[in-house]
């Protein structure tokens, strides 16, 4: 099923060398005669004046231009001591700091990316000047570089050949590689011959008429039973029959079923049948149907209107499709008239009806191409029910385009030879631009690009041309070069300056090449770009063509009649030509070269078809043709060539086979493909166990030492090295090929000067040896490296096929998996993504690599240093850069060796998983996999399906943890089957130790103790205690490897036997063992820094603490049950015992000396709304916790002041309350005022004498805050009822006011002034002790003006009284609050203002005496103070003071009524007779003068 990694699939071809007399094609850069190595070396000697003894000791075999150019440019000494280092270098940072597996993984990632982004195979720029062929006319003449070798020959049985030769009408033959059968038609009989068994063949002879065409197609989906994978279509002269084919691949037994489906095709003469695999649609064309394309319809149902099988013409109307196909051609004279309008440039002198000769389909783009008998190509887009088009390409168009290119005037593309014999589509994966390749009768390949719209082809254009190789001799090449040099010299003269430059010699000779003349329709192109040409030549024709090509190009060509030559007998020669792009040269040097030669064949070729899958490396043009990337994982390409008597199997020669043939001199391989590829192949050959010891030894010698004196393989320090990864996407050009080659030859990559004290391992260019090792590992695993390890039930895109391209990663659809489906299956994972056979294949290959590294790993990783010392015979001081380079090399190679070991363990794990999934009696069904995965939690399964093979092979801690879950599942399953944990775990550790360490073994033993404890329950306390103690002790030993999931599982088993207090103690011990250095506490103390490495210890502790809290929740729930628990695993206990169990559990937690745990436990209680429990806790940590958390938690602050008050610490309680009232917490203003009130109450409580002064200061601050809060509350009330404010603004103001207590400045500037709350402003003046008289009086004026604006003067007394009441209320309210401040409430100034305000605003008759003075008295001003203020106003008034007199009169009368003492000193008569106050009749003044005392009256002036 799989190609063996370290075994050759066929015999190696004998080593061959090239003859120096053979002709060599020319490169595009240097036109020199190619007469072999000796001449090149001598010419180089003349130019350089340097000896060539080194090159002569290593003769170069082959005619590859790169090898010859390299030889020519070499000088004495070693050829590039650092050959290809620069080209292969990948700079990976962290060489000295990365973990080995991480470092190796980075290199594999980069190399995979590089392999997947190599150049596109066919670009126009590659061969504008002709194709650079490495060509030999001799059969298998390229020696080691011959692309194909004959592997086997299957002769057609004699009885079939005899019957074939006695056919009466028509015979045909072909190959069905899908069935491993050869088909042969003889008249009306079809024979299916088993290629692998000469005596096994089947005959289908149900047809009555001669068979015209046979085809094998895939059926439409859901039409036949699943066993039917193919349909056999047999077209006769009358009908087209359909047979169902079933093939048992295990036994190779073929079954043919007659479906009884057929359709009449009389008059069509079917010539070709093709199918569109995506839709299953079948198309065909016929010689008698002109240019029409038909479609065959079939179904599994038959009704009144539609038959099961029918045909429809897709290229003409329904009416015309009803007429006989050849009716038009039967009309006399039609052919002659048609011929008048046709191009007769082919010179055949006649005319014929144009018909289709071939159909082909571009399966990806959905285009069907037809080739006509007149070499016209037509393209149609396959739509749902029809064909859109056509887009036509005619020979005239091709000739016109050729005339505008360098291919103009090419004899091989003249009218006589511009006949297309075969067309092949180019898949978009191979080339996005190219659509089609057409082969001409002269062996020219015409490449067409195109563009598509949504439902049509927008354009098909001739893009490039590949001419066949030329067979000219070196003498002719030399003659042409001399001629071009003469022409070049002429151009230096003015007269010749306008002459056009001559075309390249290579192109000039290829344009008239006759090597592939008479190419037949059996020729083909096999992706990617492999050209097979079946050629028919006569011996006379071959001789004449060679003579013509080798004739002088400078003079006139020789005419056929110049000499009379004796005619030789004419014999036909059947040749098989193959030309394969050398992709190794293209990706290494950016130069396009094709290896071309003739292969041995026994007779006329009937068909050429690939038997195995192609070696496409990606699904995109970049990297598609990279055969080096897939050489270890893809099946070797085999091509079947069907002749008239046999089937010849040709096998593509892989790089390792080329290297084996060149083992005595691998220099050509190095020059072509680079030293890294050579080292990779050498390592591969070294590991082949079926090769000779000498061959493997030579390969190992090259891997370790290179070619001494010619190719040194060692690392180099270069500070300015640039990684090739950054330029992967740049397109190599021919202009860069020579430059890169010269750099390789002359040793361009030299150590850069560096500071001796400053060396970076990242600047080392590692040796090709390392890259060879890395490439082999990368390519071996390329198909699975980025692929998911496991599949889900919903992922149907993955099959169990061994290899799937890494460019199309598999992504499990976890989110699409329905919950009911998960619950039904109890699993997300369905299976491993690769089969057991595939795992064993990889494992066997990795084991061989691992054994190689065990034997040679130490010497290879340290080979550079000994090599330097061994070659340091001249006493040279070893440069520090060499030491650094060797150190980096050793690190990198050791990383790869460790990666191989890790891959081995990862694959071993998967192998164990398959083995454990085996169920006896059900081989290869792995029914136990579902049971194993069922032990894994769904959360872990979700992580497992995201796991790539890359993660498995270079596992981090998380990956190892996930794999351990599966290993634990295997152990659990074995436990259920009665197996021993010890035995199973030990076996797992031996096979995949990195996933099953010694700690895991201890963990498994602990789980075993817990399992037994659970089984015992509470029936036997001593045994139970024994197992639980042992389990906890074992788990505490492996605390560093104990995952939180395992810890949960262990605790769950402990709690099932009521092991609550000890479980809590165990968990807290685990938490402290995880963090023995108390790093978590340091992390907290330093403020939870974001990039602090100690955070991981903190996180671990928190996870364990959460388990403690979960345990406490469970014990709380247990205690709250009223009735005893009677579950199977728990003993019945009374409710009192449950309460005691909870009490002991909490005691175990609270007595544990762990500050961090206590803090988190208190946080947990608060989060559970059980903060009141904190008031009852007496631990050393509770008060510090409350004090620390109070500043950031409102709940904790409330708890703290209650905590203090319960312990009679009233000052501390008041202080906390004051802080709360002034804090930034989200507290309403009312609550803040309440806090202040409580705080004030605590200040008035009994407290120690030492706190008296502090309490007084605190009480003062509280009082100030209360006053401000009161004003803020007044503003809030006004805002609530203020209709002037917009609702949105009002909400914002309310939100601001109903929160934090603001400052007086904020209240004044942001609220009182903008909202014109004048009375509030006066209140703020008072509490702020503001004394600016002018500002204060201005605010009073604003207040009076605002009141005046509210008065509606209608002249009615009622309105006047309302206004008086309004004014009175405002002044009384203000006065009561500020009257004790003479600055804010200056009565001497306010009284006249109020009087003027009254009398200016209201009618005098509405003003009652005493209305004004009563306002001040009600506001709290005393009578005697008011008396002296009025008296002074009267005495100092310059104007009419009648208003003051009236108010004084009312004041004295009211004083008399209200004050008993006043009545005692003033006589009633004085009051009765006081009608109008004057200074002269003032009773108070009279009393003072008479008595000489003031009777204790406090005078205002004082």
Swiss-Prot record:
Residues 1-31 are annotated as: Disordered. Residues 18-30 have a biased composition (Polar residues). One of its GO terms (cellular component) is nuclear membrane. Disulfide bonds: none annotated. GO terms for biological process: chromosome segregation; heterochromatin formation; mRNA transport; nuclear pore complex assembly; nucleocytoplasmic transport; protein import into nucleus; protein localization to nuclear inner membrane; RNA export from nucleus. It is a peripheral membrane protein. The modification Phosphoserine is found at residue 1247. Functions as a component of the nuclear pore complex (NPC). NPC components, collectively referred to as nucleoporins (NUPs), can play the role of both NPC structural components and of docking or interaction partners for transiently associated nuclear transport factors. NUP170 probably plays an important role in NPC assembly and organization. In addition it is required for chromosome transmission fidelity. Belongs to the non-repetitive/WGA-negative nucleoporin family. This is Nucleoporin NUP170. The lineage of its organism: Eukaryota, Fungi, Dikarya, Ascomycota, Saccharomycotina.
